[in-house]
Design a protein with these regions (language model features):
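Conserved beta-strand positions in the central sheet of alpha/beta enzyme cores
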Residues: 71-72, 85
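Conserved, mostly hydrophobic/aromatic
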Residues: 45, 63, 74, 109
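Bacterial Sec-dependent N-terminal signal peptides
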Residues: 1-24
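Short, acidic/polar
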Residues: 52-62
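Structural preference for beta-strand elements that scaffold enzyme active sites
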Residues: 41-43, 70
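Metal-dependent phosphodiesterase/phospholipase catalytic core, i.e.
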Residues: 21-33, 40, 87-122
Length: 122
């Protein structure tokens, strides 16, 4: 059940990130048009991770400004049951932290820095 809730929250957050740009009704109509449209929906994986830190507000803003239809995100739960946006189960690749997201509290994660797409601390 917990995994289902986390999945639903991540889907809603991803749609909400772009809803103000094109409108949620526009996106939902394209998702549920029964295959009648030739529209190709563009979804950014982990935000604009090639040009900004992965899953960062900067990357999401670039996606929205660029007209992207949606942003795919993954969510994980911290040790104190807070939900954070993180692609990996671990912090090592994209932050200055080490180990599992679930081993850290939200306050501890807030003390970490993100890394750029080439691993430079931001």
């Amino acid at each position: 059940m917990r995994k289902i809730i986390v999945t639903l929250v991540s889907m809603l957050l991803g749609l909400n990130a772009v809803a103000q740009n094109k409108g949620i009704d526009f996106l939902l109509n394209k998702l549920y048009d029964g295959g009648k449209s030739n529209y190709v929906m563009i979804i950014a994986h982990r935000g604009n991770w090639r040009n900004a830190p992965e899953n960062s507000l900067q990357g999401y803003k670039q996606c929205i400004d660029g007209g992207i239809d949606g942003i795919e995100i993954d969510v994980h739960m911290t040790k104190d049951s807070a939900i954070v946006i993180m692609h990996d189960d671990t912090l090592d690749r994209t932050t200055t932290g080490k180990g599992l997201v679930s081993d850290y509290t939200l306050e501890q994660i807030k003390q970490l820095n993100l890394k750029s797409p080439i691993g430079v601390v931001t």
